[in-house]
Amino acid sequence: MAKAHAFSKKVGWIELITGPMFAGKTAELIRRLHRLEYADVKYLVFKPRIDTRSTQNIKSRTGTSLPSIEVENAPEILSYIMSDNFDNEIKVIGIDEVQFFDDRICEVANILAENGFVVIISGLDKNFKGEPFGPIAKLFAYADKITKLTAICNECGAEATHSLRKIDGKYANYDDEIVKIGCQEFYSAVCRHHHKVPNRPYLNANSEEFIRFFKNKKRNKNV
């Protein structure tokens, strides 16, 4: 006899929506949640208080928005769900701007999924340095479904996979603060080849040597 959920999925999993800035991550989160309304599925959205761009709402750059609950940290999500304010008919939890939470969000997401909640998470995959942002690398491992979106490179029009930060027209230094809330005044989406981070350190002793070698090789080829 086939197992009970051979052709359907038991409720309780994690969906991750990620990518660079201007890729439509929040818009996709809102779209998925709005879609559930056709099936009369109730949901609740949380976001970190550090995101000051739209108080008490998650808002996409296309203008769509949803009410949300701001929390100081990930465990507050569990506390709210255990409180008298929580509607027990809610089975879907949305979490936006997940990169601003610490690693405790991974445990929160797993606990929710293990207890029958569908958890839909959105956030940046990389910081301005091009490195995993906050808990995102671990969430890649924990997520049951992953959607990686791209934007359009502001420099060449190719698919953009990185978020570039500039301050007063200058590239942000590798040692600059990781979190700097802002939009187009500081950031643009770029492809790998137009992503610049001055003073980025290299772990391998011969990495810089290889970069110089390859640049010289290309230069000599064009002579």
Curated annotation (Swiss-Prot):
PROSITE patterns: TK_CELLULAR_TYPE. This is Thymidine kinase. It is found in: Cytoplasm. GO terms for biological process: DNA biosynthetic process; thymidine metabolic process. Homotetramer. ATP binds at residues 19-26, 96-99. Keywords: ATP-binding, Cytoplasm, DNA synthesis, Kinase, Metal-binding, Nucleotide-binding, Transferase, Zinc. InterPro entries: P-loop_NTPase, Thymidine_kinase, Thymidine_kinase_CS. GO terms for cellular component: cytosol. The keyword Repeat does not apply. The keyword NAD does not apply. Zn(2+) binds at residues 153, 156, 191, 194. NCBIfam families: PRK04296.1-1. It catalyses: thymidine + ATP = dTMP + ADP + H(+). The gene is tdk. The active site is at 97 (proton acceptor). One of its GO terms (molecular function) is zinc ion binding. Its main location: cytoplasm. Belongs to the thymidine kinase family. Gene3D superfamilies: 3.30.60.20, P-loop containing nucleotide triphosphate hydrolases. Its EC number is 2.7.1.21. It comes from the Bacteria.
